[in-house]
């Protein structure tokens, strides 16, 4: 089974990806892990990626696409299938993935899209606060400190509501064309992500069992 998982930051995509891998035994292919492995193994694309990263530059699409292709060509993929997580990030990468899969004789079986209302995600992501003295992390709503005093806590710039909203807007602008592309191919299953983790996975599992 060859899968792609999508969802906005904070939607719980990583949690569900781990559960899918555990339950279905597919190879988990996350962008970060792929880059680290390619650089550690000094593959052709890994060396290229490292040359950009060492200079503090963005890795071009053709290198990222090349690293994905190297990983998808490995033996375990044909045997176990895969779950792509964090790629493609742009419609151009989605088209490159289509070409790679065709070249390798593989096909995508389904796209799981974890949907959560953006306003809920802003609350989830912007509630994180850090204790100035201990460095402990809490959440204003989901894990509040017992003795909360505003002056004892601070919030990282990345966690402020306006920053979170901007990040979500960018992700939505990039993600929508990708989802639309896969919807036209009748590959997308939308999963309601604003429920308990176990309930989300029950819906994911049901959708995947129907694909088998």
UniProtKB/Swiss-Prot annotation:
Region annotation (NMP) maps to 30-59
| Listed EC numbers | 2.7.4.3
Amino-acid positions noted as binding ATP in the UniProt annotation, renumbered to this chain: 10-15, 128, 137-138, 195
**Single biological process term from Gene Ontology:** AMP salvage
Which Pfam families does the protein's record reference? Answer: ADK (PF00406)
Q: Name one GO cellular component term.
A: cytoplasm
Which residues are noted in the entry as AMP-binding? Answer: 31, 36, 57-59, 86-89, 93, 156, 167
Q: Does the keyword Iron apply?
A: no
Keyword Kinase listed: yes
One GO MF annotation is: adenylate kinase activity
**Annotated spans, LID:** 127-159
User: Per UniProt, which keywords does this protein have?
Assistant: ATP-binding, Cytoplasm, Kinase, Nucleotide biosynthesis, Nucleotide-binding, Transferase
Q: Which reaction does it catalyse?
A: AMP + ATP = 2 ADP
Report the superkingdom from the record.
Answer: Bacteria
To which pathway does this protein belong?
Purine metabolism; AMP biosynthesis via salvage pathway; AMP from ADP: step 1/1
Which SUPFAM superfamilies does this one have? P-loop containing nucleoside triphosphate hydrolases
Q: Which InterPro entries does the UniProt record give? A: Adenyl_kin_sub, Adenylat/UMP-CMP_kin, Adenylat_kinase_CS, P-loop_NTPase
- NCBIfam families recorded: adk, PRK00279.1-2, PRK00279.1-3, PRK00279.1-4
> Can you tell me which family this protein belongs to?
Belongs to the adenylate kinase family.
What assembly does the database describe for this protein? Monomer.
The function of this protein is: Catalyzes the reversible transfer of the terminal phosphate group between ATP and AMP. Plays an important role in cellular energy homeostasis and in adenine nucleotide metabolism.
Q: What is this protein called?
A: Adenylate kinase
């Amino acid at each position: 089974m060859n899968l792609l998982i999508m969802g906005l930051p904070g939607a719980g995509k990583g949690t569900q990806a781990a559960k899918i891998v555990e339950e279905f035994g597919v190879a988990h292919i996350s962008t970060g892990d792929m880059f680290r492995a390619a650089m550690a193994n000094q593959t052709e694309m890994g060396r290229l990626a490292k040359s950009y990263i060492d200079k503090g530059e963005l890795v071009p699409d053709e290198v990222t696409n090349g690293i994905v292709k190297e990983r998808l060509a490995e033996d375990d993929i044909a045997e176990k299938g895969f779950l792509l997580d964090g790629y493609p990030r742009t419609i151009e990468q989605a088209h490159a993935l289509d070409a790679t899969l065709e070249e390798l004789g593989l096909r995508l079986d389904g796209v799981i899209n974890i949907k959560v209302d953006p306003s809920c995600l802003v609350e989830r992501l912007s509630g994180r606060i850090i204790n100035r003295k201990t460095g402990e992390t809490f959440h204003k709503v989901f894990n509040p400190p017992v003795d909360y005093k505003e002056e004892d806590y601070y919030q990282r710039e990345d966690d402020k509501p306006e920053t979170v909203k901007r990040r979500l807007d960018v992700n939505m602008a990039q993600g929508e064309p990708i989802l639309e592309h896969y919807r036209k191919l009748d590959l997308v299953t939308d999963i309601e992500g604003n429920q308990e983790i176990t309930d989300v996975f029950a819906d994911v599992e049901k959708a995947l069992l129907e694909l088998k």
